[in-house]
């Protein structure tokens, strides 16, 4: 998504955050590994909620596999946010007002960052392990014929 100059200025805060722009897909995981906090965002203004309600973004499994703290922003009644909440795999912000408070709390509490990173990694290993999913799938499809 291309951002306006105003949006770039709002996101780039001196000493806190910077916007790198676009990177090739093969560099995404490398950049995620370098990050302290991964930010997952859904539409908190209800514009696309009907389509996002039951969606499960592949970005979720990508983030979980990195073993990094996740800050998830979005309404509490959509699948991705419900999943993060149930799994205790992210710090949740359901409104715009919660973002700064939750982010400051994470920055001031490295122990909480590490705990949430561990929760995310464990959730990814437990629920999104490709080998385990293949085994379950083939077992369901082929049953005793394996």
Named regions from a protein language model:
Residues 2-6, 75-78:
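Short, polar loop motifs at secondary-structure junctions
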Residues 3-37, 47:
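Nucleotide-activated donor-binding/catalytic signature segment of Leloir-type glycosyltransferases, i.e.
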Residues 7, 26-28, 59, 98-102:
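Short acidic active-site motifs
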Residues 26-33, 38-64, 70-82:
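Nucleotide-sugar-dependent
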Residues 31, 102-106, 136, 140:
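CheY-like receiver
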Residues 57, 75, 87-97, 105-111:
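Conserved acidic donor-binding segment of nucleotide-sugar-dependent glycosyltransferases
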Residues 94, 110-141:
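A charged, aromatic-enriched C-terminal amphipathic alpha-helix characteristic of glycosyltransferases
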Residues 142-146:
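Generic C-terminal helix-cap and adjacent flexible tail
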